[in-house]
Amino acid sequence: MGRSGRHDATMTPPPPSNDLHDAFSADFEHELRFTRSVLDPSNPLLRDLVGWSDRGPRPGLIAVVDSGLHAANPGLPEAIERRFDDPGLPELRETIIVPGGETAKNDPAVVETVLSAIDTHRIDRRSLVAVFGGGAVIDAVGFAASTAHRGVRLVRFASTVLAQLDAAIGVKNGINRFGKKNFIGCFDVPVAVVCDEVMLETLSDRDWRSGFSEAVKIACLKDADYLDLIENNADRIRERDPDASRPVIRRCAELHLHHITRGGDPFERAEARPLDFGHWSAHRLESITDFAVTHGEAVSIGIALDTMYSHLVDRIERAEADRVIDVLKRLGLPVHHEALHGEAILAGIEEFREHLGGRLTITLLDGIGRPVDVHEIDPEVVTRAADLLS
Amino acid sequence: MGRSGRHDATMTPPPPSNDLHDAFSADFEHELRFTRSVLDPSNPLLRDLVGWSDRGPRPGLIAVVDSGLHAANPGLPEAIERRFDDPGLPELRETIIVPGGETAKNDPAVVETVLSAIDTHRIDRRSLVAVFGGGAVIDAVGFAASTAHRGVRLVRFASTVLAQLDAAIGVKNGINRFGKKNFIGCFDVPVAVVCDEVMLETLSDRDWRSGFSEAVKIACLKDADYLDLIENNADRIRERDPDASRPVIRRCAELHLHHITRGGDPFERAEARPLDFGHWSAHRLESITDFAVTHGEAVSIGIALDTMYSHLVDRIERAEADRVIDVLKRLGLPVHHEALHGEAILAGIEEFREHLGGRLTITLLDGIGRPVDVHEIDPEVVTRAADLLS
């Protein structure tokens, strides 16, 4: 029928269908790059990742910097400015410093500031937000970027061990509300995650060490060989030897990436969240202590608790459980906290269930690299596990 | 290697890779249901869509109702309460009335109210938000639901023609900020979209008619036969004959659904947005007139303008352009507004570009069902097109 063809006015309309069901899929790409001195003008990485190819107007860019990173690297804003002088890259329109650590996720002003800068500088869906910082700042800034214009392009420059091997790899973001961690957030895939080794050099010893608990977690869940690698390098990692730390950080990032891209549930719609091993108590511990315990430390304690619990319910052998706990200690991480003994910690079980919804699903260990999901936790056994760790 | 196997301490770590790239895809399902009297306890649809199967705790539900819908149907909250008394459905925990129309998207209190209710009533990712209303309320409530716990389940009950054939079908949501339409939002797929014909019966004549401009738009873009169907039924549609309107509404919803699920770009990452035909001026017209023009009316005017523009740049024949404009008029829709003649309307071109980013991309018509993307708009031709419509 031609484009001016007409049906007769008496035609029967197509029978109306009551049910329209359609399945579809969407494709995503996840780029993760390790480098040194990404802002050095001789480093080609940024041109490779976000180079401007002269098609359409030159895109804009705003940079958002974690105050903690800025304090340790006062020259960073100038280095960012110098790098984006390059006409082959997006045009830098503003550099904003935002509070680092959990404040970034607790203070709604951080998201507001970034949204307002996106508006003021006309950052559109082809333009960029570049965030430089730790996991909390990346989470909060990422939420702003993902919701402005339904998603402007985000490049995450992960500046902590925790961010480089875990937090910045994920495809989610979020902020805290109503006193609950990550109450608000969404799933989104960044344009790229850049892990610059130089940024780790100015971390405090405490922040350096805090990151490696997530590596132990991934080893417990995914790869017994990887626990060997951590174990064999633990003392040198604690002493911040970059050659010992580098392969541990990269392998963790890779395992995390593959969990998302090859695990079959990138946007966490299934019941289980295996990567949250040790996290029910960790989240709660952070909030009970008003974040005096870092996330990495809380995760270390949470791993120790759920590993010992796994032993007490006859899953993992004592020698293996002790091995996990020993690695954490050798990395300079805590495996116990007084708050584990009170009633308050147990509220973390229900909070954890509620965030995910449906049945409680907690990951335990049948062995190293052999996770198992359970749907009940016995508070008395939690207390006994805490006692064994004290 | 057994689970307590160890590598030798002198082993060579795996060579660190600088670049980790992984592609992945995610699967989605889109459910669209047409029915009558969905809240009648004898209607099995809700049990079919969101029935509770006794696995895990009974999920919760909050209902959010558009004030416009509530004003026209004061018994609605009670009907919702009665329906969800059914133990085979989620448990209703609160029904909230929120301002209808564009106020829902302009007033940040609407999103806040819904987030706060999600927190108070412990609505988790397995629980539900049910929104009853027009496109604007569905957009704002959807944004809250999509970002709480990174997405609680949402069922959209579309109560207007515009929502049933267009707004509620999309996989996005959003609110206005900084005086810009949809500045904040995200992509998300609802659990289901329910179109209840009974809800349309209490619409004002103006709101009834406003919905059909999107049907003409879809016909212009996708399906010349569908324009025949609208044309042949236009007079009866204007008079609100349900038998003439039903197939037009359902076919539009179906074309819209297939655009999303089969068009290859469900989350609009490509440059073109063909479904936004006529929308650059429509969005601007709404904002210039402070929403005195409804979205559907503005879209009708925008379609007429871009169709006439297409003729003036030698794309569509005059007779075909006139046919589109005539259908709009016969549906009782406006095709002209005084504000089309000023400078102010032209700012809509840049606003439209900015929201999408990159090059300007405007859809014109080479014929009915034959859209074409262009990257430039001549302001003088816009003015001549407006003159021809006045």
What are these regions (language model features)?
Chain A
Residues 2-10:
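Short, Lys/Arg-enriched N-terminal segments with co-localized hydrophobic residues
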Residues 12-127:
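ATP/NTP phosphate-donor binding region
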Residues 16-20, 25, 213-216, 315-390:
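C-terminal charged capping/lid subdomain of soluble metabolic enzymes
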Residues 55, 121-124, 147-149, 176-177, ...:
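Solvent-exposed alpha-helices and their adjacent loops that cap or buttress functional pockets
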